[in-house]
Amino acid sequence: GCSKRDLDDFYAALEEADLVVIATPVYHLSFPAPLKALIDRLQRYWSARFILGKRPPISKGKRLVLLTASGSGSPEGGPLLEKQLAPPLTVIHAVLAERVHAVGADSPDFEPAPYLEAARLAAHRMV
């Protein structure tokens, strides 16, 4: 485990959660560093599964909603983050239930309304 026990409250909340929402910008077709660091700190669940053989490492299953925003107009960012999230989702007993990937946010012509509506509809499907 990590030498610092600074995420104990986070781990407890994660283990009890029914739903996890990740809302993040896409930086260079990846996660920003603070989110990547948090994902890396899920190592305790990876170790529980693959070293200790505990399957699933978190007994309570959960659904995950991924909301991304890319500055560029390229649609690649959100789906790449989905692929990067796939392994950590298995060890936290989560399935990607909904996703909304906003693209072109840096454009002066960017219109957020369709993405906000898609996120609203995704939220309604989660309840």
Regions found by a protein language model. Give the residues of each.
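Short, basic, helix/turn surface patches
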Residues: G1-L7, K54, A118-V127
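Helix-loop-strand module that forms the ligand-binding subsite of alpha/beta enzymes
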Residues: S3-A86
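Glycine-rich phosphate/pyrophosphate-binding loop and the adjoining helix
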Residues: P75-P79, K83-V127
